[in-house]
Amino acid sequence: MLMLSLTATAQQKREFRGAWIQCVNGQFQGLTTQKMQETLIYQLDELKKDGVNAIIFQVRPECDALYPSNLEPWSRFLTGQQGRAPQPYWDPLQWMIDQCHARGMELHAWINPYRAKTKGTTTLSVNHVVVKHPERCFEYDGLTILNPGIAENCDYICEVARDIVTRYDVDGIHMDDYFYPYPVAGVPIPDEALYRQLGGNFSTIGDWRRNNVNVFIRQFYETVHQAKPWVKVGISPFGIYRNKRSSDIGSDTNGLQNYDDLYADVLLWVNNGWLDYCVPQIYWEIGNKAADYDTLIRWWAQYASGRPLYIGEDIERTVKAADPQQPQQHQQQAKHRLYEQLPAVKGTVLWYAKAVVDNPGNYAAMLRQLYWRMPALQPEMKFISKNAPSKPRKLKPVRVGSDYVLFWTAPKVKKWDEEATEYAVYRFNKGEKVNIDDASHLIAITRDTFLQLPYATGKQHYTYVVTSLNRLHSESKIAKKKVKL
């Protein structure tokens, strides 16, 4: 079945192919530096083979840090004890940036904005925000939450983001679905007094809570882009915005709602341009009675395509569910058929990286051999900058010992959006028309200014085309060279 499908799947030239690497599942807790690095290297190597081109790496799960910070303590999910530095000392965020960039992957730093203490955390560091400012937090269902209604918390989270973006060469900064806490029946959020004090302009506490988050999202976006305009801000909200019974534009679903239950007005953020990409977590299966995947992906494609739309995909649930049309198969192929029907969907983020590497139901093998077998550029973001770099200069094939290498020179630069940070390389056979919109000719995406060529007899004629890509993956005009291999 896999081989029969090979020719039927079109390769996208541009596609976000992401995977989340989380720390809150304890996969790194207490590992030695060497063992954690070995684990991550193995995961990244396998994900690279699977076609993944972006990693979303959790670096701030509970107002702590998987990087050295003057603002927040080291995370217990790294060392086993909050505030304890890793030994031997290392900086996981910087290390991951280096590792991802070396593999041609983007690195997006993933932070949880309001969550300050998870249920499993018993001891807080003396410099943790909950210890320093307990008056700015509330307890809910075993969690400690930075109260979104307190302006100092908004400023504080933005300061953390500015610190990360300023000090690190991250490609993006990412928040997931945790804003106000997930509701527990019969347990009210303890912010009524603050609403009475500060919410006079709002007719309901829900409107006030949504405004608190809206103000934060806008300030967060502006903070990141003021520091580095090319760093992308992404959010992966819960998979249902509103149900049809709550809103005329709601989806035909019956589940928890971003807008009403988490006070996250995701469509407002998309429509106002307060994020650069949106990744709704559509973790259900096709045919789910309360939250059908087919219904939801079509809903998000219709209503949330004002910014690049990627789909958050739970691969373990996908491979446990049968394809309604072909019950002998799981749902990976059926979901991919939906992507191909919806041009508004620009990519996928896989929950979660280790599960991909474990290859349940041959999910990763299908990516590697079929869907993501060819490299893909990231989606463009012309709404940040319309500029593109100049084309590469001085293309020259050179014999280096027994190898044949194509060299080129970076274009000249005046502004950040004219800098070439990567290059796309295409290959065309003799007589073929040069068409870089045809993704089948894209053979490599590299940060180097050279590429080793597959030399054979010296009698095969090819045209190699190289283009420059800036930090937003805008592509230059072509530079080309005829080569005999």
Q: What are the residue ranges of the model-derived segments?
A:
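Aromatic-lined carbohydrate-binding/catalytic grooves of carbohydrate-active enzymes
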Residues: 51-87
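Solvent-exposed loop/turn segments flanking beta-strands in beta-repeat/beta-sandwich domains
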Residues: 411-438, 461, 478
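Pro/Thr/Ser/Gly-rich low-complexity, intrinsically disordered linker/stalk tracts
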Residues: 362-418, 473-485
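Beta-strand-rich modules
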Residues: 452-476
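Active-site-adjacent "subsite" loops/lids of carbohydrate-active enzymes
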Residues: 14, 20-22, 26-34, 38, ...
